[in-house]
A protein has these predicted regions:
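Short aromatic-enriched loop/helix-cap "lid" or pocket-rim segments at secondary-structure transitions
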Residues: 72, 99-101, 162, 188-193
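Active-site rim/loop-helix segments in enzyme catalytic domains that contact anionic ligands
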Residues: 2-144, 170-174, 229, 247
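Conserved beta-sheet core of the metallophosphoesterase superfamily
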Residues: 160, 164, 168-171, 175-178
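The feature marks non-catalytic terminal segments
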Residues: 2-3, 8-26, 108-114, 143-144, ...
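Histidine-centered beta-alpha loop that forms part of the nucleotide-sugar donor binding/catalytic region
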Residues: 63, 153-154, 181-183
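Short beta-strand segments
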Residues: 87-90, 150, 179-181
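Proline-aspartate-enriched helix->loop->beta-strand connector
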Residues: 114, 137-155, 161, 165
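Active-site environment of divalent metal-dependent phosphoester hydrolases
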Residues: 68, 95-97, 124, 156-161, ...
Length: 256
């Protein structure tokens, strides 16, 4: 089933092609199972689609699985709680070394409530694949109108992170772009944007990170360390908890 916007914002059309026959059959079966008139179910589905399109949308660029959760997991939890639609792109899952990382990332994304996709770029070789990464971001920018994009800070010293952020700056020129901190990769960073968080957001962030059993050996996965960072950022904002960001670009009209 392919949705198409009509001439007016409130008008939606759908077309059925051979490729989507199974979707249409599923749609009819759903109506039958619920003893519901197809036209009523279609009306409800259209209404749901319109409401979803009205949601503010955030995209999180995660060079490796776990970067998104480490850098802005609490903020993701808060945005979703407030009705935002959040999508994350994991660019590398290191499948050759840790095949289970894919499942870990999927479970983490589900806990936070965000949609996700997992790509298969080779870790440490993002500079070589820069053009392919640029194209992926370009395609996303054409497909969705994001209000907010998260990416590693511009001073992140990891080469993979640097490529993702550089290409994000090229592509996402019409929306707010914030750089999330990963302290072990940031020797010099200016955090000038802080998002206040509640304890429940931090709990969800840590629960999501606990899915990454393969990564728990790293010092930055220590629960006390994770809590100390959000507490420190909270002190800077005079609030119990916060996550800090580098303001790369702000477009206020899309955030209000």
């Amino acid at each position: 089933m392919v949705w198409k916007k009509g001439k007016k914002p409130e008008q939606y059309l759908f077309t059925i092609t051979e490729e989507f026959t199974n979707d249409w059959n599923t749609f009819k079966n759903k109506a039958s199972e619920n003893n519901q008139n197809i036209s009523n179910l279609l009306r409800n589905t259209v209404s749901s689609k319109i409401n979803n399109d009205k949601k503010k949308k955030a995209l999180v660029l995660s060079p490796h699985t776990d970067d998104a959760e480490l850098g802005c997991g609490g903020t993701i939890a808060k945005l979703i709680e407030e009705g935002w639609a959040v999508h994350v792109i994991y660019f590398s899952a290191v499948r050759t070394r840790f095949p289970q990382l894919v499942n870990e990332a999927e479970n983490s994304a589900r806990i936070l409530g965000m949609s996700y996709e997992i790509l298969d770029f080779n870790t440490r070789y993002f500079p070589r694949d820069r053009q392919d990464i640029l194209q992926i971001l370009h395609d996303h920018s054409r497909k969705e109108n994001y209000n907010l994009v998260f990416t590693p800070t511009t001073t992140d010293i990891h080469q993979d992170h640097g490529v993702v952020t550089t290409e994000a700056k090229r592509i996402f020129r019409k929306c707010t772009l914030l750089g999330y901190e990963l302290p072990w990769n940031n020797l010099d960073v200016s955090l000038n944007c802080f998002i206040p968080l509640e304890k429940r957001h931090i709990k969800k962030k840590i629960s999501a990170l606990e899915c990454y059993n393969t990564q728990k050996k790293h010092p930055y996965f220590d629960k006390k360390f994770l809590e100390s960072v959000v507490k420190m950022r909270g002190v800077q904002l005079s609030t119990p908890f916060a996550e800090g960001f580098e303001t790369i670009k702000v477009r206020l009209d899309q955030l209000i």
